[in-house]
Amino acid sequence: MNIEIDTYTNLPCEIWMHIYSFMSGELELFFTNKQFFSLLNCLNIDIKIMDYVYSKGYTVIAKYIDSLKESENELTKKDIFKEVDINKHFIDNCKFGRLSMIKYMVNRGVDITINYNIASRLSVQYGSLEVFEYLDALGFYSETEYESYAYLAAKHGCTNIIHYLVKNYCVGISDYDDLIMRTAAQFGHLELVKYSIDNRANIASYNNYALRFSSQNGHIDVVKYLVSKGADLNAIDRTTLRNIKINGHTNIISYYDTIGISERNSNSSGFYLP
């Protein structure tokens, strides 16, 4: 026999609240459907629902609550449904790449440039290209900000962001003394270094910054690649070699030793080939 059971109506509100007590403060049970959502009327806890919804990126729930408020639903007149500052949640949603919630918040009038565009900087840092593209299309960025975005993307190895910036003429590969290539080398992002050099970045820019700092930071793959591309080994002077040792990168020291570079044949301004 096929018996249909309505789980929601067959259990009293008190039982559902007891079940909720085992859920460590998570509210997802109430977001299952409209019937369960109405159980929030029975909830007796000190929590702001909108804080929870925004922090989780639940755009559909946020829009549903908006519709209830517009219809003056009694449930949404409870203190737990009071509005909260969406600016701080905007920052977190940009960090986590939640585009639908970001669009929702923009439509709600969020301050896109809050804290010196920290939201967009986080989208770059975490490689959220869709979010960055959307925010960029809103037209709030200056040339100086594009420079900082290029640095952040290169620092964190976000090749997708770099491709976007270059393709859309926001920055050039050689801009700011080959900032993209230098930064990528410094932080060990080999593919981005290759991309930059393939697109005519100057390997010796800024006093051979790329080779010196990739060496001091222990990025052996980057070092070997730069050397293979003709990096000026005179940049590896005695001071640089000592810094490499201080940082504990014995593999770099060993590599340089195999190609004839060591403190024995170096001075403060460059090495002498044996």
From Swiss-Prot:
Cited InterPro entries: Ankyrin_rpt, Ankyrin_rpt-contain_sf
SUPFAM superfamilies per record: Ankyrin repeat
Entry keywords, A to Z: ANK repeat, Repeat
Xref: SMART domains: ANK
Repeat positions for ANK: 85-114, 145-175, 176-205, 206-235
Pfam families, A to Z: Ank_2
The name this protein goes by in its record: Putative ankyrin repeat protein L589
